[in-house]
Amino acid sequence: MTTPPSLPRHARVVIVGGGVIGTSTAYHLASMGWQDIVLLERHQLTAGTTWHAAGLMVTYGSTSETSTEIRKYTRDLYGRLEAETGQATGFMPIGFIEVASDKDRLEEFRRVAAFNRYCGIDVQEISPRQVQELFPLAKVDDIEAGFYVKEDGRVNPVDVTMALGKGARMRGVKIYEGVPATGVLQKNGRVTGVRTPYGDVQTDFVVNCAGLWARELGALSGVAISNQAAEHYYLITETIKDLPPNMPVLEDPSAYGYYRQEGGGLMVGLFEPVCAPWKIDGAPTDTPYLDLEPDWERMGRHEEILLRSGKFHARPEADRRRGARTARLLCRSGTQFHRHPDGRRSRPCDGALDH
């Protein structure tokens, strides 16, 4: 029989959600000198959607100075977190290439690159031939150019989360797994605590980092959070013979996808232009590590673009594949939000991030 956790009666901050967002929030609050921080996770760390995130670490692409600075900081953090905590992050600075397939995108990406250089990112415009040298499987006969950041790359999302969690614990944060938040206590329009099956924790601040479940958690205190889960797909090929090691991540917005190495094969990820909503009435809470059965009929035409007419020289091995259908979080504006959702105090929300 599992011993019930012994929760503190009070914490200055209670963070709900143990994915990469929740552990990062805990780590950074503690790094800023905040004390008496508690993180609650319903299942295990990473068990929501973090565990199957693609792990792309990309600084290129934003025309927001704030977003660009966050990306730069994050890349630096992932590079030093292992030395700080002794926990690997899986950060591999293998490079990132975004390809422009027409004149309009070329003009757009040149503007983005100019802004990113202004912000201190070393973006290089490279020729189609150089794209193929870096990513030999790329089809480059119909692209205008690539935009290459050598220092970008990929991480292991589970390792990053564990490293952030370890760093948070080293700074005094208490992390409790297997403890769901079942209610948010309030008085006079302010949060006063969090209810769990193991007792209430009185608190001054609740940070909603519940990701796919952020809307449901917000509803417990009457806060409307405008996000919705949507289906999200990727393929993993079997081993591809003679695949060069450490190829950069390649992204092609005209094919709605990206390509990166996964083991001895490739992960081919899809960003559908029209997403399919998933569980409009709320995501299930009793199933950790969600892994949904692929809808091949719906995915088929996008798969054809990615593997046949996209920027990818398909090999026979790529036809033997494992598909994955997961749930991805979208918010109404299409961007992240970090705020008090209803203007009232003590309810910060980091719940509408797509990692």
Each language-model region and where it sits:
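Short beta-strand to alpha-helix junction loop
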Residues: 69, 99-107, 147-166, 176, ...
